[in-house]
Amino acid sequence: MANKKKVALACSECGSRNYTITENPNRTERLEVQKFCKYCGKHTLHRETK
C-alpha cells in the first residue's frame, strides 16, 4: 500500500490551516473548496498547502 501524504487546507483570508486531507497522486492542480473558518466565523475559500 502506498503512503499518502497529508496536506493542509488553509483559509485564504486569515491563513489559518483548519483542515487536513490525504493527497490524491492523480490530481495535479491544487484543491480549492469553500469551508467554514472558525477563526473568521464565516465560509471562506480554503486552498491546499504543502
Swiss-Prot record:
One Pfam family it belongs to: Ribosomal_L33
GO cellular component, one term: ribosome
The keyword ATP-binding appears for this protein: no
A GO biological-process term: translation
InterPro entries: Ribosomal_bL33 (IPR001705), Ribosomal_bL33_sf (IPR038584), Ribosomal_zn-bd (IPR011332)
Keywords: Ribonucleoprotein, Ribosomal protein
Gene3D superfamilies: Ribosomal protein L33
GO MF terms, alphabetically ordered: structural constituent of ribosome
Family indicated by similarity: Belongs to the bacterial ribosomal protein bL33 family.
HAMAP family hit by this protein: Ribosomal_bL33
Protein known as: Large ribosomal subunit protein bL33B
Gene that this sequence comes from: rpmG2
